[in-house]
């Protein structure tokens, strides 16, 4: 009886240890792509988004006019693609 309890305990402890080791290695693998992508797409601190005189697709068109190829939706006040029912 004692040997069976000890073997079950050791088996359970081994499974827990295996789980912890696998989880640790998996979390390290998940961090690697994040670090790689952040270094590839690193943005310069001085980089600023260029201001446009017109609003692009799905942007508000209350104060700005829509860029060429888009029309201002009268219902939603967004710049959308022109369609026959929007003319």
Curated annotation (Swiss-Prot):
GO terms for cellular component: extracellular region. The presence of a 'disulfide through disulfide knot' structurally defines this protein as a knottin. This is U3-theraphotoxin-Hhn1a 12. Disulfide bonds join 54-67, 61-72, 66-79. Expressed by the venom gland. Transmembrane segments: none annotated. Pfam families: Toxin_12. Its main location: secreted. Ion channel inhibitor. Belongs to the neurotoxin 10 (Hwtx-1) family. 51 (Hntx-8) subfamily. Hntx-8 sub-subfamily. InterPro entries: Huwentoxin-1, Huwentoxin_CS1. GO terms for molecular function: ion channel inhibitor activity; toxin activity. Residues 25-52 form a propeptide. Residues 1-24 form the signal peptide. Keywords: Disulfide bond, Ion channel impairing toxin, Knottin, Secreted, Signal, Toxin. It is found in: Secreted.
């Amino acid at each position: 009886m004692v040997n069976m309890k000890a073997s079950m305990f050791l088996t359970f402890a081994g499974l827990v240890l295996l789980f912890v080791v696998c989880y640790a290695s998996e979390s390290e693998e998940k961090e690697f792509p994040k670090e790689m992508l952040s270094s590839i797409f690193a943005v310069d601190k001085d980089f600023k988004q260029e201001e446009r005189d017109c609003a692009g697709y799905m942007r508000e068109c209350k104060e700005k006019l829509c860029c060429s190829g888009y029309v201002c939706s009268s219902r939603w006040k967004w710049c959308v693609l022109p369609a026959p029912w929007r003319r």
